[in-house]
Curated annotation (Swiss-Prot):
Keyword set, alphabetical order: Autophagy, Cytoplasm, Hydrolase, Nucleus, Protease, Protein transport, Thiol protease, Transport
Gene Ontology MF terms in the entry: cysteine-type endopeptidase activity; protein-phosphatidylethanolamide deconjugating activity
Gene Ontology process terms (BP): aggrephagy; autophagosome assembly; mitophagy; piecemeal microautophagy of the nucleus; protein processing; protein transport
Family that this chain belongs to: Belongs to the peptidase C54 family.
Name of the protein: Probable cysteine protease atg4
Coiled coil: none
Feature: compositional bias, Low complexity: 66-77
Entries under Pfam families matching the protein: Peptidase_C54
Record's function text: Cysteine protease that plays a key role in cytoplasm to vacuole transport (Cvt) and autophagy by mediating both proteolytic activation and delipidation of ATG8. Required for selective autophagic degradation of the nucleus (nucleophagy) as well as for mitophagy which contributes to regulate mitochondrial quantity and quality by eliminating the mitochondria to a basal level to fulfill cellular energy requirements and preventing excess ROS production. The protease activity is required for proteolytic activation of ATG8: cleaves the C-terminal amino acid of ATG8 to reveal a C-terminal glycine.
Region called Disordered, residue ranges: 65-91
Compartment annotation: Cytoplasm; Nucleus; Preautophagosomal structure
The keyword Lipid metabolism appears for this protein: no
Length: 439
């Protein structure tokens, strides 16, 4: 008897007809977005929301004054239609699908950086190995279309874009506060976006990521990045900024965070504490996230210091910023838009330029469908923040994905790993992660 692949037909139907998801969690579970909690009302109105009481160290909730509408082409979602959902922006509250309006406003306020096209060319590598490191589609495009260099990162830049989004939102929180929503402080937002313009003059442009990836991470232009390479680029590019307002601590090939090393970056020579971005590169299983880590991973997005998760999607990378029960909400970089220009005068950015960096469309993915290779980020603003975060990491339910210790054994000549480290979180190297996190 012939076996019928029902899933194949389901994906085909969803390719042409993908209904809007609704907030149909029977328990009316709260929704979390980078440390902010949104409670769902039991009232009949699908858009009604009950705001949670202030949390210790929490932030005020706000609503935006504007919305944007975006469209993702079918070719960027066909591989995930069965397990992901989309939400199209609508102007009326009655069509919000049961999602709290305050949550949608918060989601929309996050900076969303995607594939871009028609930017100044990124020169190809002359290394004979560079061509074989590209995917077949990128290789063909480079030979037939981008013969003079890469003018688009479509097909290979998704991890870079996820990393850019993560860094941009860390800067957004640092400069404008967690409570910021669209419709205010537009010039300050433009200043942040200009840092990520698709131009080699912008300090956090894709050109700069590719340049450092080639020189320090062994990544050729047009080659997929993994979380490890993205973290190293974020750290290097941030450190290259004179009088940077932000510092970056990366865990390297492990999930252990050491206080002495962290403080040497955030507060060198016992000087004033500088806000520091912690980037934890980890792999929480082989092909799927091991269930024992589920609760701890959910908790990472509930902490006030959370800046999200980059990676974590089979065959691609996304930027995860929210969670409800076991569903994770994310911003998808797999949509090609015109290049974001570099402007010396930030007032020259048009409303269309700004709108292209935001979306009100929700996408969600069950944790069992997520790829285990990822970059988890936290913004530590001061020493009290550090103490709160360290306590929260220690108190998570389930098996922890992050471990904090007082001293780095390598710095003190101890030469010993933390007990049980080998048996816990599986880490990755660049050869590993890039096989699963492609653009």
């Amino acid at each position: 008897m012939t076996t019928v692949d029902i899933g194949r037909y389901k994906r085909l139907v969803q390719y042409f007809w993908d209904p809007e998801p609704t907030n149909n969690i029977a328990s009316k579970s709260p929704i979390w977005c980078l440390g902010e909690e949104y409670l769902v009302s039991d009232k009949s109105s699908p858009s009604a929301v009950t705001e949670s009481p202030p949390k210790e160290g929490g932030y005020l909730l706000a609503q935006s004054l504007s919305t944007t509408e975006t469209t993702t082409p079918p070719d960027s979602t066909v591989g995930s239609l069965e397990s992901s959902s989309e939400y199209d922006n609508c102007d009326t509250a009655s069509t919000d699908g049961g999602w709290p309006t305050a949550f949608l406003d918060d989601f929309e306020a996050k900076i969303w950086l995607t594939y871009r096209s028609n930017f100044p060319a990124i020169a190809k590598s002359q290394d004979p190995k560079a061509l074989s490191a590209m995917s077949l589609s990128v290789r063909l495009r480079s030979q037939l279309v981008d013969q003079g260099g890469f003018t688009s990162d479509t097909g290979w830049g998704c991890m870079i874009r996820s990393g850019q989004s993560l860094l941009a939102n860390a800067l957004l929180t640092l400069r404008m506060g967690r409570e910021w929503r669209r419709g205010s402080s537009s010039n300050e937002e433009r200043k942040i976006l200009s840092l990520f313009a698709d131009d080699p003059r912008a300090p956090y442009s894709i050109h700069k990521f590719v340049e450092h990836g080639a020189s320090a991470c062994g990544k050729h232009p047009g080659e997929w990045f993994g979380p490890s390479a993205a973290a190293r680029c974020i750290q290097a590019l941030t450190n290259s900024q004179v009088e940077s307002e932000l510092r970056v601590y990366i865990t390297g090939d492990g999930s252990d965070v050491y206080e002495d090393t962290f403080m040497s970056i955030a507060k060198p020579n016992s000087t004033k504490f500088t806000p520091t971005l912690i980037l934890v590169g980890t792999r929480l299983g082989l092909d799927k996230i091991t269930p024992v880590y589920w609760e701890a991973l959910k908790s990472s997005l509930q902490m006030p210091q959370s800046v999200g998760i980059a990676g974590g999607r089979p065959s691609s990378s996304h930027y995860f910023i929210g969670v409800q029960e076991s569903d994770f909400f994310y911003l998808d970089p797999h949509q090609t838009r015109p290049a974001l220009p570099f402007n010396d005068n930030v007032e020259d950015y048009t409303p269309e330029d700004i709108d292209s960096c935001h979306t009100r469309r929700l996408r969600r993915l069950h944790i069992k469908e997520m790829d285990p290779s990822m970059l988890i980020a936290f913004l530590i603003r001061d020493e009290n923040d550090w103490k709160d975060w360290r306590r929260a990491v220690r108190e998570v339910q389930g098996k922890g994905v992050i471990h904090v210790a007082d001293r780095d054994p390598a710095l003190h000549g101890l030469g010993a790993e933390r007990d049980g480290a080998i048996d816990e979180v599986e880490t990755f190297d660049d050869d590993d992660d890039d096989t699963v996190l492609n653009g």
